[in-house]
Amino acid sequence: MAPRMLIAAIGGATGSGKTTLAKHLGRIIPSLLVFQDDFAPPEDKVPIDPRYGWQDWDDRPGAIEWERQREVFHSIRESGQVPPEHSSHDHLNEQVPVEIDVETERKWSERFAALREQLGPDLPKIVVTEGFLILVDPETSRQFDLQFFLRGDYATLKQRRIDRQGYHTAEGGFWKDPPGYWEKCVWPAYLSAHAPLFVDGDVETGAIDPQQGIELFETQEMTMDDMVNRVCERIYAEVQNKSTAAAEPEANGH
């Protein structure tokens, strides 16, 4: 029998705070972290944009090895573990720290510790995943119990991308955006990939299509503490719901 699982996915543009939020959650909640960047193709397989002659790491079709991602999440759902052949290079990339209040971390750490003690082996295995395209593949999204989208404004996201300098690749290389890459590649690819999730395709200011089951976070209006609190609330409630649902058949003698 497949283990009880709860998978929470955090999407949004580059620089929106996804990874920072996921790592805060990983420190608070006994959980497994999965980073979508680890599903990027090898450097020599990244498509070349014929218009500009540079590698395109951001356009949806070639930015992720989609079948590998689907297989890993299916395996996680079925076994509760990451396949042994899957590896992460997240540790190579430095992040600008965005701290949260110690009281926020303490409060939720204690609540989840108490929940773990209360439920024991009935506590679902919790997985937190994040990525700039993590919500756009319907086959992968079917594995998610909770979905969150972090929306930021153009100017802030662009400046954060500039400040980041570049990205380490799984092979040990380093990718630095060429001039114009944000305007000609990153931003258009982000809008195109996420348009199906929004009413009238309006990614920048529109509402998320209610059928998607995604909760929208406006990062210009929320602190990191706000987002940590909101996601912890949702995960905590979902754990309780799953535990209640699992206990009902036993109570009915089934």
Predicted regions, residues:
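P-loop (Walker A) phosphate-binding loop of NTP-binding proteins
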Residues: A13
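A glycine- and Lys/Arg-enriched "phosphate-lid" helix/loop adjacent to the NTP-binding pocket
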Residues: Y52-D56, E139-L197
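NTP-dependent small-molecule kinase module
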Residues: A2, D163-G166, K184-H254
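Post-Walker A helix-loop "phosphate-sensing" segment adjacent to the P-loop in P-loop NTPases
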Residues: R27-D37
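Hydrophobic anchor at the beta1->P-loop junction of P-loop NTPases
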Residues: A8-I10
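Conserved lysine of the Walker
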Residues: K18
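Hydrophobic positions on the alpha1 helix immediately C-terminal to the Walker A/P-loop
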Residues: L21, L25
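Conserved nucleotide-sensing/catalytic segment adjacent to the nucleotide-binding pocket
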Residues: L32, P41-K107
